Regions:
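Dynamic "connector" segments at or just before major functional cores
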Residues: 1-200, 219-232, 237, 245, ...
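Secondary-structure transition/capping motifs at alpha-helix termini
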Residues: 32, 138-144, 180, 224-227, ...
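Short acidic (Asp/Glu) and glycine-rich catalytic loops that position anionic groups and cofactors
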Residues: 135-139, 225-227, 254-256, 430-445, ...
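Short, basic/hydrophobic alpha-helical segments
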Residues: 173, 241-258
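An anionic, glycine-rich sequence signature occurring as long contiguous blocks
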Residues: 214, 230-233, 280-453, 505, ...
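Acidic, metal-coordinating catalytic cores used for nucleic-acid/nucleotide bond scission
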Residues: 262-271, 289-292, 480-482
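Short amphipathic alpha-helical "interface-anchor" segments enriched in bulky aromatics
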Residues: 449-477
C-alpha cells in the first residue's frame, strides 16, 4: 500500500531551511534524451497541522516580474544631462595654475585620464577605484571627451601604469616646484594599510591615527600658500630626517637655490640643523621648550633690553634676536650612531664651534590672551569633571582624564573620590610662557622671512587635514599601485588646497569652504538635445563663488576640451 500523500496531486518534497519547512512539487520530463527536473514552490509546510500553507502570490517570481514591468519606463537617451558647474570650476582653476599643462608635458596622452580621475575624486568619491558614478552624473566625461570607462578594473590598470612611471612623476614634480621661489614647507604623516604592500607598510608602536594596522609614511611639500608641490612615499618606520635629506636631494636636482625649507618642531635637533646647513640650505623650525638653551632664552626675554616691536601681517610682536650655536657633543651619539650636536648660546664654552644659527624669541599679546583663556577653561573643566569621579582607582581615572595637564595639579584619593588642587607655581609657570614662541633659523634668515615661513608651515598641516578627509586606509596590494593612487589623490589635493588658499586670501573663510563651493557650483547643470545645448539657471551664490575664486561665470556648455592649450606647449 502506497504512503498517503499530503496533497491531492504529486507527493511534495519537503526542505528544511532554518526553522521553517518548505514544500515543493517535483516533476520531470525528457528533453533530447535527458531527464530534466522541474521544481515548483507550494508553500510552507506546518508539521502540527500536517498542512501546506499556501504561498503569497504577491511575492512569487511571476508577480515580481509583472510588477517590475509596470514600474519600468524608457530612459530618453537622446537628451544628455549632467552636473556641470563643479567640473567647469575645477577645469578653469587647473588651467590657471598650469596643472593640466604640467601633466601633459610629463605624461603625454595618459595625462587626460589622470586629471579626469583627480577631478572626479574631488567632486564625488573619496576612493580612487569608485569614481565611475561621478563620471556618469556629471559632465566630466563629456567635458574632456573621455572614452575610457574608468571603472574599478580600468583604474587598477591606470594606477599600475602611473606607478611604474616614476621618471614621469619626478618630471611633473620638477615643473610644479618651479613656482617655489621663497619657501618650501615639508612635513610627514602616516597612513594605515590593510596590506603590507611588499614591505612598505609596517607596524609602529605609535602612529598618528592610533590604528592597530600597518602604516606607511607620506611626505608632502607645499609652497607658501599651502598648495602641494611634491609628495614622496616611504616605509612606515623610516626616520623623519631621512625624508628631509630626500627633499634636499630633490631641490638640488630641480635647481632650487636660496629657498627656505620650513619644518615642524618635531624635526628640531642639533644634528638635524647641522645636516641642513652643511648642505648650504636655509631653514626655519619652531623651537621646543624642552631644550635647555630655549628655556634660558624664554627666561631672558622678560628682562631683556634688546626686545624690539616688529610688525608682520598688520600685527605687532615683541621680538628678541639671539645667536644660537652648534657644538659636537662629547657625551652622546645620534640615534644612527653618528655625531650628535648640542645648541649653545653666547658665553658658553665652545659656542658656535661647529656652526652658527639664529633664534628669534617672539611674544604676541593676542596669543597670550587666547592661551590664558583656553588654559583657564581647561583647568575649570578638569576640576568639574574630577568632582564627578566615582571609582576604585580615582587617581588613575583623573590622570588619564587630564593627560599632560596633570602636571598642574596635586592629586590624591579620598575613598572612591579624588581631591585635586592647583600646584602653587602652575599658574605662574604657564603665564610666564603664554603668548611666546621661538623660531630657530639658519644664520642668513631675517625675522620677517622666518614669520612668512612659519605661517606657511601651518598651511601644510591644513593640507594634511584635507587629505585625511579622503579614504585613509588602503587595501592596495603593492607599492606600484599605491604610487599611482597617490598621484591621482595628489591632483585632487592640489585643487582642494588651491581653492582653500583663494578663499582664505579673499577673507571668506567664515562663509565658504571647498565642499560648499563644489556643491553649490554643481547646481549648474548642462543639457544637450541633438546639436542644441544650454546651461540651467545660475544662482547668486554661484556668481559669488566665481568672483571669489577668480573664475568667469560659465556662459556655454563645453565638450571635448583638451586639458591645456596644446599649441602653447614647448
Amino acid at each position: 500500500m502506497g504512503r498517503p500523500r499530503k496533497t491531492d496531486g504529486l507527493k511534495p518534497t519537503l526542505v528544511r531551511r532554518g526553522d521553517k519547512i518548505y514544500a515543493y512539487e517535483t516533476t520531470s520530463y525528457m528533453e533530447n534524451g535527458k531527464k530534466v527536473n522541474v521544481k515548483r514552490y507550494l508553500g510552507v509546510y506546518d508539521p502540527l497541522t500536517n498542512k501546506i500553507l499556501p504561498k503569497n502570490e504577491n511575492r512569487c517570481a511571476d508577480r515580481k516580474k509583472k510588477s517590475s514591468e509596470e514600474r519600468a519606463f524608457r530612459i530618453i537617451d537622446d537628451v544628455e544631462c549632467g552636473d556641470y558647474g563643479g567640473v567647469y570650476l575645477l577645469d578653469e582653476i587647473q588651467r590657471q595654475i598650469d596643472l593640466g599643462k604640467d601633466l601633459q608635458r610629463s605624461f603625454g596622452s595618459v595625462s587626460k585620464l589622470i586629471l579626469t580621475s583627480g577631478i572626479a575624486l574631488m567632486i564625488g568619491n573619496p576612493r580612487v577605484y569608485s569614481i565611475g558614478n561621478t563620471l556618469n552624473h556629471t559632465w566630466l566625461r563629456r567635458y574632456y571627451g573621455v572614452e575610457s570607462s574608468l571603472d574599478s578594473g580600468s583604474m587598477t590598470a591606470l594606477t599600475e601604469q602611473i606607478g611604474h612611471s616614476q621618471a614621469n612623476i619626478d618630471t611633473f614634480f620638477s615643473f610644479r616646484m618651479e613656482d617655489c621661489k621663497d619657501v618650501i614647507c615639508w612635513d610627514t604623516t602616516t597612513h594605515g594599510s590593510y596590506t603590507d604592500m611588499e614591505g612598505l607598510a609596517q607596524y609602529l608602536s605609535v602612529n598618528k591615527d592610533n590604528e592597530d594596522i600597518e602604516q606607511f609614511k607620506v611626505g608632502l611639500a607645499t609652497d607658501f600658500r599651502g598648495v602641494p608641490k611634491l609628495f614622496r612615499i616611504y616605509p612606515g618606520s623610516l626616520n623623519d630626517m631621512q625624508t628631509v635629506h630626500r627633499l634636499l636631494d630633490d631641490m638640488d636636482e630641480f635647481e632650487l637655490a636660496n629657498v627656505i625649507v620650513t619644518l615642524d618642531r618635531g624635526f628640531l635637533s642639533g644634528k638635524n640643523c647641522k645636516d641642513i646647513i652643511d648642505r648650504d640650505r636655509r631653514f626655519v623650525m619652531p623651537g621646543k621648550a624642552e631644550f635647555k638653551v630655549f628655556k634660558t632664552l624664554l627666561t631672558r626675554f622678560s628682562g631683556s633690553n634688546n626686545k624690539v616691536d616688529m610688525r608682520y601681517d598688520d600685527h605687532i610682536y615683541s621680538v628678541m634676536e639671539s645667536e644660537l650655536g652648534l657644538m659636537r657633543s662629547e657625551t652622546r651619539k645620534a640615534s644612527d650612531g653618528s655625531d650628535a650636536y648640542d645648541f649653545t648660546l653666547p658665553g658658553m664654552e665652545g659656542h658656535g664651534k661647529d656652526g652658527m644659527l639664529k633664534a628669534y624669541v617672539c611674544y604676541d599679546t593676542e596669543t597670550y590672551n587666547d592661551q590664558m583663556q583656553q588654559h583657564k577653561l581647561m583647568i575649570s573643566d578638569l576640576m568639574e569633571r574630577a568632582g564627578r569621579i566615582d571609582s576604585d582607582h580615582p587617581v588613575e581615572v583623573f590622570n588619564k582624564l587630564a593627560g599632560k595637564a596633570v602636571k598642574y595639579f596635586e592629586v590624591k584619593a579620598d575613598g572612591r573620590k579624588v581631591e585635586v588642587e592647583l600646584k602653587n607655581n602652575a599658574e605662574t609657570f604657564f603665564r610666564n610662557r603664554a603668548g611666546m614662541f621661538i623660531l630657530v633659523t639658519s644664520a642668513d634668515v631675517t625675522w620677517s622671512q622666518s614669520m612668512t615661513a612659519y605661517d606657511a608651515r601651518r598651511l601644510t598641516e591644513q593640507a594634511y587635514n584635507h587629505s585625511k578627509e579622503e579614504d585613509k586606509r588602503f587595501r592596495t596590494p603593492n607599492k606600484t599601485r599605491l604610487n599611482g593612487r597617490m598621484m591621482i589623490r595628489f591632483i585632487s589635493l592640489t585643487l582642494k588646497c588651491e581653492i582653500a588658499a583663494r578663499i582664505r586670501e579673499a577673507n571668506m573663510v567664515s562663509k565658504l569652504d571647498v565642499t560648499t563651493c563644489i556643491e553649490s557650483m554643481n547646481t549648474i547643470g548642462a543639457r544637450k538635445y541633438g546639436d542644441v545645448s544650454r546651461l540651467t539657471e545660475i544662482t547668486k551664490q554661484c556668481r559669488t563663488i566665481c568672483e571669489v575664486l577668480h573664475v568667469d561665470v560659465p556662459t556655454e556648455v563645453r565638450e571635448n576640451r583638451e586639458i591645456c592649450d596644446m599649441m602653447a606647449l614647448p
